[in-house]
């Protein structure tokens, strides 16, 4: 039974919701799953003024936690076409793990959100995936076996590189059923891939 970490940063709750769906998919495939978040860099005062969602249940991750898992699925909102500074600052601390090869051969994946359809989801996925490849992870995307990402019936996230959601400019749009199904599907695929590699 593979051990999977869903590691995320969520300012407004959209990625937290996606992280829970990713975890559901991995658990459905038989994995043991932990959901953890990275530390907030913004002061509590500014976070409150900006209406950040501060009541998130997931515990704060420590960088050495990464070595304890067979698979690591990373999610963060898009910040100007790349991952958030909170996630980048966390992953930048993994130099010691990288130097020891502690993450080599693990399974990795990425998911994200943006305000608009063309708001940088794919480039953000690439920024996460690039980090994971440098760490030595084998990447699992979101293939078109998740047919929902092909729909033209509604605005929806999803890319072959990872699950995505679109939050809207004011953050009022929550992840749709199609987007949550994509997140679950990706979590399931990661768990199945890790099971093949690690038993």
Curated annotation (Swiss-Prot):
Substrate binds at residue 98. Signal peptide: none annotated. SUPFAM superfamilies: Flavoproteins. Its cofactor is FMN. InterPro entries: Flavodoxin/NO_synth, Flavoprotein-like_sf, Flavoprotein_WrbA-like, FMN_Rdtase-like_dom, NQO. Keywords: Flavoprotein, FMN, NAD, NADP, Nucleotide-binding, Oxidoreductase. NAD(+) binds at residue 12. GO terms for molecular function: flavin adenine dinucleotide binding; FMN binding; NAD binding; NADH:ubiquinone reductase (non-electrogenic) activity; NADP binding; NADPH dehydrogenase (quinone) activity. PROSITE patterns: FLAVODOXIN_LIKE. Residues 4-190 form the Flavodoxin-like domain. Binds 1 FMN per monomer. GO terms for cellular component: membrane. FMN binds at residues 10-15, 78-80, 113-119, 134. It catalyses: a quinone + NADH + H(+) = a quinol + NAD(+); a quinone + NADPH + H(+) = a quinol + NADP(+). It holds the Pfam family FMN_red. Its EC number is 1.6.5.2. Belongs to the WrbA family. This is NAD(P)H dehydrogenase (quinone).
């Amino acid at each position: 039974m593979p051990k999977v970490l869903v590691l995320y940063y969520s300012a407004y709750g959209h990625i937290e919701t996606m992280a829970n769906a990713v975890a559901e998919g991995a658990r459905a495939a038989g994995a043991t799953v932990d959901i953890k978040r990275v530390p907030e860099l913004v002061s509590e005062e500014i976070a409150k003024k900006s209406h950040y969602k501060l009541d998130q249940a997931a515990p704060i991750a420590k960088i050495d936690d990464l070595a304890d898992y067979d698979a690591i699925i990373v999610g963060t909102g898009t910040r100007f076409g790349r991952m958030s500074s909170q996630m980048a600052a966390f992953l930048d601390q993994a130099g010691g793990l990288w130097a020891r090869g502690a993450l080599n051969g693990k399974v990795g994946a990425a998911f994200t959100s943006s305000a608009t359809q063309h708001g940088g989801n794919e480039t953000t996925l690439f920024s996460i995936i690039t980090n994971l490849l440098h760490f030595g992870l084998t990447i699992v995307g979101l293939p078109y076996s998740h047919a929902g990402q092909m729909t033209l019936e509604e605005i929806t996230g999803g890319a072959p590189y990872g699950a995505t959601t679109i939050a809207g400019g004011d953050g009022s749009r929550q992840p749709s059923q199609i987007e949550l199904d994509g997140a679950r599907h990706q979590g399931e695929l990661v768990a199945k891939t890790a099971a093949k590699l690690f038993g």
